[in-house]
Design a protein with these regions (language model features):
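Positively charged n-region of N-terminal signal peptides that target proteins for export
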Residues: 1-9
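Residue-level detector of conserved, function-critical positions
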Residues: 21-434
Length: 434
């Protein structure tokens, strides 16, 4: 029998899930070494590494002795890093730049003062091209974008752009940022220049050739590292009022709000100058206004407002009241997932448990579950099943389906979400081992 990661690899074939051809999963062989299997459990890369992770794009993290590196789908080691270089795939379940489209962030702790004036040297390994940039930057923007350019900071702290296909700088580092630089979205990045007091004094739209487009006089990005969403980004005028520009550099929603958030699915949350909060459409029309002090989260055309003690109401962005959920100790109701299910949270003392309600307001699963903390937060039912822990009862884990039923019974000591057709799970054996 194959000895797989954490004891067992669940081989459920998920009906109706998206095609997962090409997924390869890390597994531990009888020889104590690691390789990769396909969805049928067949060895594709025989166990020969001291350590291995799942494939991201065309490459997988591997370890040989004290050195980390990467292997391709033929099992060939394409890069072995120096012993003190660390490859970081992400944190708290997030994959840097996306599982299939992103990077591994690489860094090396420097000994003593180095040319960057920082304790870390950073670089990246691209999951699609297999390009290793080398460790030569003060920072790398690992956030997701749909561009083959990535923002990096040089030794002065200025930001520019490197090709993920060559590892070479293509737009010189000269822009200011208080965080990670602005990545490209739909062909454009929002870049800024500061004064000596770190105030934004000029904002430009930048295309992928390096051409700069100024914004109208008196208009600047509302924040460093602005994200272009739905073709718009937040700006602020000389009076401190917020509005929106498009990727042509035109102000399409005049500055008029006390605060503004990015657009999603055609709508954005704003704070108005009278202290109320609301939702606007892409013309700037206020489609909802509330005196509630909480900023509204808009997702999949819906938002939630508290409507009493332990009571929450789901609305459409058109203002239609969809349903109200009320119950003892309910403290949160989330906007719907793509499958139309909404998570709600019950809090008793310091304990929080989650359940699910459909868009008719019917509870399909009582709030008694917690989720794997190492899976990507905010992503639920990724392949039609949701990994759950029964902390207060059996203290075991299983999988809910979209009807709220346990499709895979509570039997595991730990679980992960399904990726493709397989998920890693663990079971406690009779001798107490996992």
């Amino acid at each position: 029998m194959k000895k797989l990661l954490c004891g067992l690899l669940c081989l459920l074939m998920l009906l109706g899930c998206a095609s997962a051809e090409g997924y390869l999963y890390s597994a531990k062989g009888d020889n104590g070494l690691w390789g990769h299997i396909d969805e049928a459990g067949n060895w594709v890369i025989p166990p020969k590494f001291d350590g291995a992770g799942d494939f991201r794009g065309n490459y997988a993290w591997i370890q040989q002795g004290d050195r980390e590196g990467f292997a391709n789908r033929d099992g060939e080691i394409v890069l072995l890093l120096d012993e003190n270089v660390v490859a970081d795939s992400g944190y708290d379940g997030f994959y840097y730049g996306g599982r299939e489209t992103g990077i591994w962030l690489l860094y090396k702790e420097a000994t003593g003062k180095n040319s960057l004036g920082t304790e870390w040297l950073e670089g990246f390994f691209d999951v699609q091209s297999g390009v290793y940039s080398g460790l030569k930057w003060r920072g790398v923007n690992h956030r997701e974008s749909n561009s083959r350019l990535i923002a990096v900071a040089d030794e002065t702290g200025k930001w520019g752009y490197v090709s993920r296909d060559t590892g070479e700088m293509v737009i010189p580092a000269k822009y200011d940022s208080d965080n990670m630089g602005s990545n490209f979205y739909d062909g454009y990045a929002v870049v800024t220049f500061w004064d000596d007091d770190y105030n934004i004094v000029q904002t430009l739209l930048l295309d992928e050739t390096g051409k700069e487009y100024p914004l109208p006089e008196g208009i600047n990005a509302a924040y460093c590292d602005s994200v272009i969403s739905d073709g718009l980004f937040e700006v602020v005028d000389e009076n401190g009022l917020y509005g929106y520009c498009n990727t042509s550099g035109e102000v399409v929603i005049e500055p008029q709000f006390a605060y503004a958030f990015e657009f999603e699915d055609g709508y954005a949350a704003v704070e108005l100058t009278d202290g109320t909060c609301g939702v606007i459409d892409q013309t700037g029309n206020v489609v909802m206004r509330t005196t509630d002090s909480l900023h509204v989260q808009i997702r999949h055309g819906c938002y939630v407002l508290p409507t009493g003690e332990h009571s929450f109401t789901m609305y459409s962005v058109a203002g239609e009241e969809l349903f109200t959920l009320q119950g003892e100790n309910i403290v949160e109701l989330w906007t719907p997932e793509e499958n139309g299910l909404c998570m709600y949270v019950v809090e008793k003392g310091r304990q929080r448990r989650c359940g699910w309600v459909n868009m008719q307001g019917k509870i399909i699963s009582e709030a008694k579950w917690t989720f794997p903390e190492y899976d990507q937060p905010g992503v639920y039912f990724p392949s039609g099943l949701q990994a759950v822990y029964d902390i207060d009862g059996t203290r075991l884990a299983g999988y809910l389906d979209e009807s709220g039923e346990l499709a895979i019974p509570l039997q595991f000591s730990f679980v992960t979400q399904f990726y493709g057709k397989l998920a890693y799970v663990g079971m406690v054996q009779d001798d107490g081992t996992t």
